[in-house]
Amino acid sequence: MPKTDVSGLSMLGNQTETAANPEVAVLEKVPAGYAGTDYVVRFTAPEFTSLCPMTGQPDFAHIVIDYVPNEWLVESKSLKLFLHSFRNHGAFHEDCSIYIAKRLVELLEPKWLRIGAYWYPRGGIPIDVFWQTGKPPEGVWLPDQGVQPYRGRG
């Protein structure tokens, strides 16, 4: 089993403050092992929060990120703190969702990445945002994201 080089990380194993907003939040990466093997990495954030840019009221989402690494993996503590940096940040659902995905693509240059952002209703209407970089590599096992459409109590 390959040993992961963590020497360049600044957050893992250290006390770390949450960034004031996503633009200044630091995402870190570590080398991916198993070169030549395509596999899917999934992160699920079932309690993601941000603020409505118009009212300042909290917005909530269940976010699922899947990617096939190339040379890098996102370091999970930095991802957790990056997602937390949206907590007091005002932006529309679509902007939050796509920004998260684009930052990860910029950092990792993965073979493939997708995001499913399942937002809880605002004004009685749930907004779901889906984006991916293209077709996934052939032969990877890609499970369903497992988030049911919003039904309310009906």
Swiss-Prot record:
Listed pathway(s): tRNA modification; tRNA-queuosine biosynthesis
Keyword Oxidoreductase: yes
Pfam families reported in the protein's UniProt record: QueF (PF14489)
Subcellular location: Cytoplasm
Entry's Gene Ontology cellular component terms: cytoplasm
Cytoplasm in keyword set: yes
Family named by the database record: Belongs to the GTP cyclohydrolase I family. QueF type 1 subfamily.
HAMAP family found in the cross-reference section: QueF_type1
InterPro entries linked to this entry: GTP-CH-I_C/QueF (IPR043133), NADPH_dep_7-cyano-7-deazaG_red (IPR050084), QueF (IPR029500), QueF_type1 (IPR016856)
Record's catalysed reaction(s): 7-aminomethyl-7-carbaguanine + 2 NADP(+) = 7-cyano-7-deazaguanine + 2 NADPH + 3 H(+)
One BP term from GO: tRNA modification
Primary role: Catalyzes the NADPH-dependent reduction of 7-cyano-7-deazaguanine (preQ0) to 7-aminomethyl-7-deazaguanine (preQ1).
GO molecular function terms noted in the UniProt entry: preQ1 synthase activity
Name listed for the protein in its UniProt record: NADPH-dependent 7-cyano-7-deazaguanine reductase
Superkingdom to which the source organism belongs: Bacteria
Documented EC number(s): 1.7.1.13
Residues holding substrate: V74, E75, S76, H93, E94
Active site residues according to the UniProt entry: C52, D59
Keywords annotated in UniProt: Cytoplasm, NADP, Oxidoreductase, Queuosine biosynthesis
Organism field: Rhizobium rhizogenes (strain K84 / ATCC BAA-868) (Agrobacterium radiobacter)
